[in-house]
Design a protein with these regions (language model features):
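Alpha-helical membrane-inserting segments
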Residues: 21, 46, 50, 54, ...
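Interfacial segments of alpha-helical transmembrane regions
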Residues: 22-50, 120
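Membrane-interface elements of multi-pass transporters and channels
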Residues: 27-30, 56-65, 100, 140-141, ...
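N-terminal transmembrane-helix/juxtamembrane module of multi-pass inner/ER membrane proteins
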Residues: 1-18, 51-79
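Membrane-embedded catalytic cores of phosphoryl/pyrophosphoryl-handling enzymes
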Residues: 74-166
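Hydrophobic alpha-helical transmembrane segments
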Residues: 16-19, 23, 125
Length: 166
């Protein structure tokens, strides 16, 4: 079980980023692929930066710092738990992919409206949730840290999507 938690908390983030690169390599619509990746990463980087500013100014302890009987599954920095940077970044990345691939939110008629596109976006959302859950199970974040991170990242991504869809 610890191997699965470790995989989801540490390795899966790299797999998700790699998945976007693989998508770009194999997509026939290179410009749309670059837009998807560019806007998704832009939202994720802005969300991560804003969360980091908050964490720098308002440090908060991690669960293992408060409850000494908890042992983290892997080493991590102390004093900067809220909101989770991983949840914020990958929540924004996942929602960036979803907003751009979802038929219900698509303003651009050239976007892929297939079931495959919808599933692609949902897979990224599932990946972000798995990363967040694994970070809680690894005792490096509280549920509040990751829920707020996912929601904040998703909100920033939505704002980026709306800004660039004008």
């Amino acid at each position: 079980m610890t191997n699965l938690i470790y995989f989801c908390a540490v390795i899966l983030p790299w797999v998700m980023c790699g998945g976007l690169i693989v998508y770009l390599i194999f997509t026939k619509k290179k410009i749309a692929g670059l837009r998807l990746i560019g806007l998704s990463f832009l939202g994720a980087i802005i969300a991560w930066f804003l969360a980091s500013l908050y964490k720098y100014n308002f440090p908060s302890p991690r669960p293992f710092e408060i409850m000494t009987n908890l042992k983290p599954l892997f080493t991590t920095a102390t004093g900067d738990a809220f909101p989770s940077s991983h949840a914020t970044f990958f929540g924004a990345l996942a929602m960036g992919v979803f907003w751009q691939k979802s038929p219900s939110t698509s303003l651009d008629k050239t976007r892929d409206k297939s079931l495959r596109a919808r599933i692609f976006g949902l897979i990224f959302i599932l990946g972000a949730i798995l990363i967040a859950l694994a970070r809680v199970l690894a005792n490096v974040h509280s549920p509040l840290d990751v829920v707020v991170g996912l929601l904040f990242g998703g909100l920033v991504s939505l704002l980026i999507f709306k800004l660039f869809s004008l």
